[in-house]
Structures are given as C-alpha cells and as structure tokens.
Amino acid sequence: MAKKKKTRKELLKEPDEFITFTGKAIAFVTEYQKQISYILCAIVAFALIFFGYRFFAQRAETKAFTRLAQTQSKYDTLKKTSSGTAAYNQVSEAFQSIIKKYGGNAGGKLARVIYANISFDAQKYEEAIVLYKQALSDFKDDKFVYNLIISNLGYAYQRVGDEQNAAAYFEKATSSTNSSIREEALFNLGLIYENLGKDEKGQQTFQEILKNHPDSIYFDVVEEELNKLKK
C-alpha cells in the first residue's frame, strides 16, 4: 500500500528538527554558561602559558648563546697575549654565571663543556673532571660529543695521576663508532696498561690498532712500541 502523503497542515504542526536542536543547544549553553566559560578560559590560559613558555625559552636560549659567544671570544683574544691560566682567570666568573643561569638550556650545556676544556687548559684538572662529569648527562643522546667528553675525562685523570680511572674512561671511549676517538683511546689505553705493568693487555690493545686501524696516525708508533716490547 502506498504511504499516505502528509498534508501541508500536518507538516506545519511538526517541529523543525534543526530549530529543535538549536533550541536545545541554546538551553544547554544558558544552563551551563558558567561552566563553559571556565573551560574556555582554561583552554585560553593553557594556550597562553604554552606559547609564552616557548617564547621565553627561545629568548633565554638566544641570550645564553649570545653570552657564550661573547665570553668565548674574550677568552680566545686573551689566549693570544697571555697564558691559559691568565685567560681562565679573566673569564671564569662569566662562564659560571652562564652555567648557573642557563644550565638547562642548550647554550648553558655547551658552556659547561667549553668551560671544562678551558679549566683543563689552565691545569685546573679537578675542576675539569667535575664539569665533564656533569656534562655527560647533557649529551647522553649525542654519542660523538658524549665520547669526546669520556675521552677528555681519561686525559684529566691522567693529569692528576689517577691511571686506574684514566684507563676506565679510555676503555669506555674505545666503544666509540668514531674512528679517531677510538684510535686515540686505544693508544692511550695501551700506554696506561704498560705503566700499570699490564704488558700483555697493553700489547693486545696496540695490536687492535694495527689490525683494525691500518690508516691510523698511531700505526707507526704502535708498531715500533710492539717491536721494542718483543725484544
């Protein structure tokens, strides 16, 4: 049976769906106007905090790198006319200030490593060790810089006469995928083993350079050292 067609009068009596929905929405908004206002304010506040944080973080980063560049430039200029210790004394306070204020930023983290290098150059080895160790966590995701710091810790411990710790850090540096860092670490490790009376381990370490790094700048020196040990 064909569906009965509604008359115009009947259609006019039926509520319009859109009007009904709109009316309900208006009623809902009216009833919960305060709650909606609070939610909207919270969203706006969150957005302001987020973008405000990014803005100030970027400003802080820019300031950190600017101050670092200025301090580094001052140090380089001083080094041309004075000793590493004298130059260190002139910039030490500035580096400490950058690290204290921007230590959590990339600029501050880089300042810590540079200050450690400057401390090492000024023969402030204990201070360099502390700074290098602090910098390890800053660059744990950057394997190249991380392994450079590990290697520098080996050198710093050598300078204070702690060959056990020096060997431990050079051993870690030998795991580097960077060929130059690895070769250098192996060479220093071999020398330390000899100084510690571990001749066999020293020879094994040197042999690794000859076997795996035939183009190493240490190749001829190592070959000569091994020939001397065999006599």
Language-model-derived ranges and their functions:
Residues I99-G108, A122, S137-Y146, A173-R182, ...:
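Short solvent-exposed coil/turn linkers within tandem alpha-helical repeat scaffolds
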Residues A2-A42:
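N-terminal positive-inside, membrane-proximal cytosolic segments immediately preceding the first
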